[in-house]
Amino acid sequence: MKKLKSLALMALALLPTSKALAQTNAQVLYDFGTDRKYVTLTLEMFKQDKWGSTYFFVDHDFNYDKMDPNSDNVSLGGTYTEISRALNFWKDSSLKNWSLHAEYNGGITKNYPINNAWLFGVEYLIHDATYKNTLNLDVLYKTIRKKDQNVPMQLTAVWTCNDLFGVKGLKFDGFADFWWETHATFDGDGQAKTRHTVFITEPQLWYNVG
């Protein structure tokens, strides 16, 4: 999964497909993390319709050489995907900012799988009058195949701020995920530790030169 310290180098395409209600883009990102330092290609799509919205992204990490110290082949070493559906049949009611949410996560790397996960819950949208600035908050039940979880939940925030500080074309967006999953980590001296929670965030700053 994408992590903090990723720099968006290039947005390859922005393809509106339905009167600004849908968009697809490709991003090339370089991760400056001390244990990472590789390129990720992200394919992303968001589409609204009368019943809600659909979102997915696929990350391709070009880190084969990082996973195999005996190889200098800078090729695909891992793929991760998320796809989610928000359902909202009550857009004309006082509950219009609330939606039902269903999501799938999973992936594979050269050395290990990223176990399938299913998420179900609710999301709440906060926005200004123009929808240029939005904040989406999710509370989700999360079950991860063959993984121990003290609490089967995930909390997610996704934000977008357009024309930041009044600068036209300057955008600040990103996400933050927090969930419970028992996993091993390694400290600076190589000692393994067991942790029970995961926090991932990826803020991005964009400037549209078009």
Label each region the model flagged.
Residues 20-23, 51-53, 88-99, 127-135, ...:
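Short loop/turn motifs that connect adjacent beta-strands in outer-membrane beta-barrel proteins
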Residues 43-47, 83-89, 120-126, 139, ...:
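Residues on the lipid-exposed face of transmembrane beta-strands in outer-membrane beta-barrel proteins
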Residues 22, 37-41, 75-81, 114-120, ...:
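Residues that define the transmembrane beta-barrel architecture of outer-membrane proteins
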Residues 82-141:
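Gram-negative (and chloroplast) outer-membrane scaffold detector with strong preference
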Residues 28-34, 60-64, 102-110, 126, ...:
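Transmembrane beta-strands of outer-membrane beta-barrel pores
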Residues 144-210:
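Outer-membrane beta-barrel transmembrane domain signature
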Residues 22-66:
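Short glycine/proline- and aromatic-enriched beta-strand/turn motifs that initiate or cap beta-hairpins
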Residues 1-23:
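Cleavable N-terminal export/targeting peptides
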